[in-house]
Amino acid sequence: MILTEEKTYIINVTEVDTDAELGLNKKDIMIKYTNLELLHAVLASTMPYGRLSARYRGKRKAELQSRIAMVESVLETRGDQLAKAEQIMYLDTAERSAICHYLGIIYTRLIAQKLYGIDCMVPLNLIEQPGEKKFVKYNGAYRQDLIGYGKQNAWSVWEPVGRSENSQAAFGNGCRAASEIEKINENPLAKSAACMTYYERGYLNAVVKEPERTGDGTLWFPEENYFKAYYQPFFELFADEQPGELYGSSGGFELELTLPWTEEGKRGFRHLQIGTDSVTIALMREGKYDQILKRMENVLDLSKECRFCGEDGIWVGAE
């Protein structure tokens, strides 16, 4: 599949009731999404492995290119759905598992935004602890939770479960992990859920369940560190690519990335546009990341022609 190609896709998402077993009290939802919405989810899904290396010029572009190449290489278009590409069968089990996990993160973010209005989503192990270079733990251990944030200070915990098949054992583990957390700081959770992506007859599907909470755990971290973990990678991408325009911009800012084709036999390049408005850029420059999303709640529309703008204030376009 080609992320920069204008197209609308559908994915079947099964939503399971809180105290129901899979297959009972469920409903199937067909979600429509465009290539630009998926591209925005890929852009916004900073992966935890990125913190293993220090920042260098071009790091965020290289990470984004890697995520785009992965999605385009492991999925193929069948009508208006995405399916497992045949060539991934040449990979070994560990490689396929890693790819499924990364796809799970991207699609959990997309589904959470489309169905539940989640504006931001950050891996817990990218949120720094106060005054340290360490990251947030729960009960002494690192977890793979995705922390979501929506309007009106609505916090949520998501367990991404990416699998090649419908694994009830893996999904059950995700549900148990989601059920352990009750609060983020002093905020009761608006939602805690597991989201599993998997292939059925080759087609990409998903199932979401909000389990009954069995624990009273609290995740603690400064809110400003959460928003820094989400927005700083965008700022670094902007600053690396067009620093002169970024720091001298008085209007909206947009950069254009040149991407190679990942499809065999195609030559030349395609172009990806990423941008935001001038106020958001100013807040990024000042390191006031925690003010961006709260400001966006009062901004009616940043969308531009041939662009998709997320509720986070970041827009994408492609040609």
Which residue ranges define each predicted feature?
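Short, surface-exposed coil-to-beta transition loops
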Residues: 138-144
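A short acidic/basic microdomain associated with nuclease active sites
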Residues: 114-138
